[in-house]
């Protein structure tokens, strides 16, 4: 196996930190109360969305917390692409009720909302003041004890050191984060994932794959992120179609949950790449589902990026399960791109146009993507012209090259 180490990467001063304790297993949710109590929490703000709450998915969590003597304050107003105003409302409730801990149950939006509420609970002002951008304030304090309980296998927010929040005034999704915002504990139970419908399984699963692929190939990659990213790719490639076909396949659900978590770890505290720069900036303008948006973009992004690091894209092909023994590096790299195109088609992911995005927006979207910090981790250099080409591929306005 070729290790594909680059001298310029070895000369960087890397860091990797895991602030989150990870506990997992089928039925793990029954341990929630005792685990949250061990963090010193006696009154928790439970952050979730209306759908999860109405479906009863959060019920066993609430029951376990109460059995452990923990008072539960419910905040079940989470929206997709959570806005600043939602975070403000949640933090006001947290302070008013004198909570001393947070429990997030749901997908990335619920977990990111809880993280951002934690920022406002421990810092002056709004989470907007702590955007990861020049001229903004860095986080100074650890958020209150946060336990994340994912009900999807996609964002990896259960272990990432970032929250993505929408500034509605700017039509812009921004990051806030670092080790101080990460969850203290995550409890991953695949039994909470069986109710995910196939289309959600598809878009969240490809999002997990996208995290792993972008973090494995990004300019900031390091050996430890390579290791977890590759394992995430292997798990997801092996299990995603099974989970899509049969939501009650617990082995597949467990494998996808592990893929999402490992892909989240591969982020570390660094950047990702073009697909997430594009989806994040697009999501601030149009209320698209993040995972579905990323999934529609991954084929064109990989088609552009493979030339930036062909050896790693060839290794990705192996992780996908492709027999590359008789292929050249270039052939294997291209095979990984075509595998992704086929996966998106097999899992019936809607195109960007079907998601409500117009080709007329390409110029604006390309400009916005260039402003996103994840652009700078991309394995192949980007400019507006490059983003323009990728977006045109998303809309089939320019010929395929692999």
Swiss-Prot record:
Pathway: Amine and polyamine biosynthesis; betaine biosynthesis via choline pathway; betaine aldehyde from choline (dehydrogenase route): step 1/1. Pfam families: ADH_Fe_C (PF25137), Fe-ADH (PF00465). GO terms for molecular function: alcohol dehydrogenase (NAD+) activity; metal ion binding. Signal peptide: none annotated. It comes from the Bacteria. Its EC number is 1.1.1.-. Induction: By choline and by high osmolarity in the presence of choline. Repressed by GbsR. Involved in the biosynthesis of the osmoprotectant glycine betaine from choline. This is Choline dehydrogenase. It comes from Bacillus subtilis (strain 168).
């Amino acid at each position: 196996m070729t290790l594909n180490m680059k001298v310029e990467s070895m000369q960087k001063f890397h860091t990797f930190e895991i602030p989150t304790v990870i506990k997992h297993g089928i039925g793990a949710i029954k341990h929630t109360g005792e685990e949250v109590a061990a963090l010193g929490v006696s009154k928790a703000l439970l952050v979730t969305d209306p759908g999860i709450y109405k479906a009863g998915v959060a019920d066993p969590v609430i029951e376990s917390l109460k059995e452990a003597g923990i008072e539960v304050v419910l905040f079940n107003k989470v929206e997709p692409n959570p806005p600043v105003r939602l975070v403000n409302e949640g933090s006001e409730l947290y302070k008013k009720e004198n909570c001393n801990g947070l429990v997030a149950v749901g997908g990335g939006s619920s977990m990111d909302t809880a993280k951002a509420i934690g920022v406002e609970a421990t810092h002056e002002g709004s989470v907007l003041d702590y955007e990861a951008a020049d001229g903004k304030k860095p986080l100074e304090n650890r958020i209150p004890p946060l336990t994340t309980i994912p009900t999807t296998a996609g964002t990896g927010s259960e272990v990432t050191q970032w929250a993505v929040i929408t500034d509605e005034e700017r039509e812009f999704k921004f990051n806030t984060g670092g080790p101080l915002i990460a969850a203290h504990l995550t409890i991953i139970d695949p039994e909470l994932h069986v109710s995910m419908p196939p289309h959600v399984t598809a878009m969240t699963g490809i999002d997990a794959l996208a995290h792993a692929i972008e973090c494995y190939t990004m300019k900031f990659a390091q050996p430890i992120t390579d290791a977890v990213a590759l394992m995430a790719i292997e798990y997801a490639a092996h299990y995603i179609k099974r989970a899509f076909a049969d939501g009650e396949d617990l082995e597949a659900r467990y494998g996808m949950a592990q893929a999402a978590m490992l892909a989240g770890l591969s982020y570390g505290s660094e950047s990702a790449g073009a697909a997430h720069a594009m989806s994040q900036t697009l999501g601030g303008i149009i209320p698209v589902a993040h995972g579905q948006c990323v999934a529609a973009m991954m084929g064109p992004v990989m088609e552009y990026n493979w030339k930036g690091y062909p050896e790693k894209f060839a290794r990705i092909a192996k992780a996908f399960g492709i027999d590359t023994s008789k292929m050249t590096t270039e052939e294997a790299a291209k095979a990984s791109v075509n595998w992704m195109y086929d996966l998106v088609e097999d899992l019936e992911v809607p195109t960007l146009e079907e998601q409500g995005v117009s080709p007329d927006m390409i110029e604006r979207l390309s400009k916005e993507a260039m402003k996103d910090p994840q652009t700078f981790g991309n394995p192949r250099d980007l400019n507006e012209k490059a983003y323009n080409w990728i977006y045109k591929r998303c809309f089939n306005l320019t010929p395929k090259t692999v």
